[in-house]
């Protein structure tokens, strides 16, 4: 029998605007290829939290989606901080990335406090930033990605990748 890997997908109902479920499917597939048995727990507002968590994935949502989940999210904040401190791997994209930071300020000036797992804050802009990215890391080589967002993120401390 293969080792089970419990994956929590955070708020897939409200925070999946750009097909972030594809990240969940990709992680599931890669784990299965390496002989693991991935088990995905979709956590939405009002759901029970799973007993065991090996990894957490979170996606993007419009500002309205973030406002919709924020109360429930803060009820889970201490648990999420504790899991992060324990080294549980987490991949946060877009809106949940912003909420894992210190705060997110929308274009209209509304400030949504985050839970402070990531030492950064994000400020919404009137112009979207869209396009391919290539950054070089001494540790990982070229890191290739794609951006499509209106928020500009500022690091509070230097992070090396």
In which residue ranges do the predicted regions lie?
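Conserved small/polar residues in nucleotide/adenosyl-binding loops
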Residues: 159-161
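A residue-level signal for conserved active-site and pocket-lining positions in enzyme catalytic cores
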Residues: 7, 115, 146-148
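Conserved anion/nucleotide-ligand pocket segment
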Residues: 137-155
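N-terminal beta1-alpha1 cap of cysteine-dependent amidohydrolase-like domains
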Residues: 1-85
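A short acidic, often aromatic-flanked loop/helix-cap motif at beta-alpha or helix-coil junctions
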Residues: 46-51, 123-124, 154
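Fold-independent oxyanion-binding glycine-rich loops
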Residues: 11-12, 43-45, 59-61, 93-96, ...
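Short helix/loop capping segments that flank catalytic or ligand/cofactor-binding pockets
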Residues: 18, 126, 156-157
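Cysteine-nucleophile active-site neighborhood
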Residues: 63-140
């Amino acid at each position: 029998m293969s080792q089970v890997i419990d994956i929590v997908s955070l708020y897939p109902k409200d925070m999946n605007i750009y097909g972030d479920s594809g990240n969940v499917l990709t992680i599931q597939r890669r784990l299965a290829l390496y002989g693991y048995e991935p088990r995905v727990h979709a956590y939405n507002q009002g759901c029970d939290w799973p007993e065991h968590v090996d990894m957490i994935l979170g996606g993007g949502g419009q500002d309205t989606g973030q406002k919709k989940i924020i109360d429930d999210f803060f009820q889970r904040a201490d648990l999420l901080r504790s899991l992060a401190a324990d080294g549980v791997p987490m991949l946060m994209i877009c809106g949940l990335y912003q909420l894992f930071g210190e705060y997110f300020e929308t274009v209209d000036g509304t400030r949504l406090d985050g839970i402070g797992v990531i030492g950064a804050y994000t400020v919404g802009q009137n112009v979207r930033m869209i396009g391919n990215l290539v950054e070089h890391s001494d540790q990982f080589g070229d890191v290739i990605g794609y951006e499509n967002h209106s928020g500009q993120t500022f690091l509070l401390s230097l992070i090396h990748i």
